[in-house]
Amino acid sequence: MGKIIGIDLGTTNSCVAIMEGGQPKVIENAEGARTTPSIIGYTEDGEILCGAPAKRQAVTNPKNTLYAVKRLIGRRFEEKEVQKDISLMPFKIVKADNGDAWVEARDKKIAPPQVSAEVLRKMKKTAEDYLGEEVTEAVITVPAYFNDSQRQATKDAGRIAGLEVKRIINEPTAAALAFGMDKTSKSDRKIAVYDLGGGTFDISIIEIANVDGETQFEVLATNGDTFLGGEDFDQRLIDYIIDEFKKESGVNLKADVLALQRLKEAAEKAKIELSSSQQTEVNLPYITADASGPKHLALKITRAKFESLVDELIERTMAPCVTALKDAGCKISDIDDIILVGGQSRMPKVQEKVKEIFGKEPRKDVNPDEAVAVGAAIQGGVLQGEVKDVLLLDVTPLSLGIETLGGIMTKLIQKNTTIPTKASQTFSTADDNQAAVTIHVLQGEREVASGNKSLGQFNLEGIPPAPRGTPQIEVIFDIDANGIMHVTAKDKATGKENKITIKANSGLSEAEIQAMVKDAELHAEEDKKAHELADARNQADGMVHMVKKSLTEYGDKLDASEKAAIEAAIKDVEDVLRDGDKETITAKTEALSAAAQKLGEKMYAQQQAEGAAAGATGQQAEAGEKTVEGDVVDAEFTEVNKDKK
């Protein structure tokens, strides 16, 4: 049985971990880093780059380099958060045929799960390279406040990447697992996980209890904002730099996508530096040019200035914290530990705010970038039976219900209900002789149906004619351990029922997912061929270099015809090196190897002759030494014997 890997699929960075010898281990990627930028670049020649290589070419290829796509996953194009991002991103966010928010690169529409699948594939490959075996199963984390559509879309991304997603777990819960696994406290403790990542914010109140020798992680409440994170902090800094540059030079950089990409990189770097320094300088020579010539950007930014720019964003994390505490039935004094997760939580001002909310210092012994992947790996170990005596009780973050008469949402499952769970309620018809009912499934906290997220709708038909209010329609909601919902509607009189696994009235269809899986497999085949071609080129190049070197040293030992044949074979290889296919390059390399055989024989013969000559000289010298040494030994031996007599 293969390993179940744990993947933190982040907005800005992603991370992969496994269980090894009973302990979680974060795996370094091919570039030697423990986290991978969640960035995908589509190059002109059709190559798909992921991680650091994609980030490096972003400045010269801004329209085809996709980042922060997790903010769009499972979202509709019309949503105000999506509309806000359209003006900020250098790449195109477009409306799909089903109304979802998709992206565009190289004139091709791409679904966010397809982009996320490229990141997941990189994580999968990282684990496979380390383990030396194929990986097909994973636990993937999502923000606790992700709705059903976003969870389903994440699961789809896993499938496209060739992974069976064994479990979707919430990021704060995963971080709690990572924190609590090595704590052997006998008493129960309540912890707050404050997770401010690249694109999302979550707060979860979790109780870690020891129940009959089993460590139980129970999520008491969760809250958050799925459109608040480090990317927004970067944007505040970018906007400030643009405004300052405009004041100074009169040039607006907002329309210049190349300049914006350089600014994004510089802003992210400056933000990180300001967590450890009081001041930093953004220096971007040749940022743009006008009629008067090139323009350079040089701007000093203090920590205080940056804090004032993002103060409102930090403030926005307060209300969810207060709500989560209230929903959990906890007072601030009940919280034993506060854990910080997500790169943005490293900002000193954020840590100050957390201390202000909870009245105590947050812990610093949890790595904010790796804790979530570590927790996912532990959950993988639990599912595999490798980690024992751990029970995870997660919750559904938002209430679930259906639309009833008057456009009202009737809740069947309240928010923060432990999952998996099941609930049912009986409804009836609104009109006389109504033959069908439409079950409109909603997720959210508003009383008015239109104020909540529509997860989908389906019909139950064939209801026998009867006065309104007479038929008994039972609606059953069933949420699995991934937080994904299955809904059944049943006419109690006839036994007729209809059921669906909720897919947003958008979302990817099964056919689309299958097409994307095939496309991914095709790319994998292309990648393999590209790898084999690169290997063939390297081998050919090495052979040419070696033969040329040998020809310089030993070419005078060859006949003119032999030398000409080798030189011709070298030229043949050099001619196909750039544009030839793998088979042609391999054939020409083998032909060169055969032609160079004669040269090899001459080299070997000369080396043998030189070796023999050197050996003969050495033997003579050694014999002389031995004679002298032998005389001495004999004389000494004789002396001793004489004395003994």
UniProtKB/Swiss-Prot annotation:
A single MF term (Gene Ontology): ATP-dependent protein folding chaperone
Membrane spanning stretches: none
Regulation: induction: By stress conditions e.g. heat shock.
Coiled-coil region(s): none
Disordered: annotated segments: 604-645
UniProt superkingdom: Bacteria
Protein purpose: Acts as a chaperone.
NCBIfam families for this protein: PRK00290.1, PRK05183.1, prok_dnaK
Protein name: Chaperone protein DnaK
Organism encoding this protein: Dechloromonas aromatica (strain RCB)
Lineage of source species: Bacteria, Pseudomonadati, Pseudomonadota, Betaproteobacteria, Rhodocyclales
Gene assigned in the entry: dnaK
